[in-house]
Regions:
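Terminal accessory carbohydrate-recognition/targeting modules of carbohydrate-active enzymes
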Residues: 2-248
Length: 248
């Protein structure tokens, strides 16, 4: 598993600007200002990031688990292009330690593992640091970085459950589902996971998700994609799993 340099805004965390990953700017300056158009009752419980006309709202633990009027998700051009993003490590949800919005387009979530039990033995809680970095720009950048402090190598799985419902922001606010249109079966090809919606007027909306490194397997459960990496974590050696989400 490859490691990646920690994304950072240049000049200190308090300054807006491009977030740099492995020496490359993920995106440039923020665009329009203003709070994302999500239900007011949900806004206070979410981390909201914005760049231009795109915005993302995630839970304090970094997950997206969209429900009626929850407002969670990745939005572009008034359409929700990502309605679910759930992380588990070793089949368990990470234990949240802290989360913070570093700038209007950049958030960091720190967590640790729950107790993991498997054929190789038990990994005690608070053995693995799990750091999520969320950056919104022309695309969504989502990194899961793991670092084990167990004295021996830990072998475990990392899973992301992903889905896109393509609801528009007015339906999210008012609770409902658009009539007409068709959600096609998700697919995985050439290292990319794709979700496609064809509106009643024939317009196509697509969510394309890049995964690096290549996952061990990708399974489907209806409109959900289950992405699984089998990872080895030597003591103190970081492992980075990177997800990019593009909305068309």
């Amino acid at each position: 598993m490859s490691s990646a340099a920690q994304p950072r805004p240049p000049g200190g965390e308090s300054e807006p600007g491009p977030v740099v990953v492995d020496g490359t700017a993920v995106f440039g300056q923020d665009g329009e200002e203003g709070a994302p158009s999500v239900p007011a009752e949900a806004r206070g419980e979410l981390l909201a990031l914005k760049s231009g006309a795109a915005f993302v709202c995630v839970r304090p633990d970094g997950d997206i688990r969209a429900g009626p009027v929850s407002g969670e998700g990745l939005y572009a051009r008034d359409t929700r292009h990502l309605s679910e993003l759930r992380l588990s490590v070793g089949g368990r949800q990470p234990v949240l330690l802290s989360s913070a919005v570093v700038s209007g387009h950049h958030a960091v979530i720190n967590a640790t593992n729950a107790t993991l039990t498997g054929a190789a033995g038990t990994v005690a809680q608070e053995t693995i640091n799990i750091r999520r970095t969320v950056v919104i720009g022309e695309r969504l950048y989502y990194e899961v970085r793991l670092q084990s402090f167990c004295p021996s190598t830990v072998r475990t799985t990392v899973e992301l459950v992903l889905a896109a419902d393509f609801a528009d922001v007015f339906e999210v606010r008012e609770v409902g589902r658009r009539s007409g249109g068709q959600t096609l079966a998700p697919s995985f090809r050439d290292g990319r996971l794709s979700f496609v919606y064809v509106a009643k007027d024939g317009q196509r909306r697509t969510t394309t998700i890049g995964l690096s490194p290549a996952p061990t397997r990708v399974d489907f459960d209806g409109q959900r994609g289950h992405v699984v990496w089998e990872v080895e974590l030597p003591p103190a050696q970081p492992c980075a799993l990177c997800v990019t989400v593009e909305a068309d």
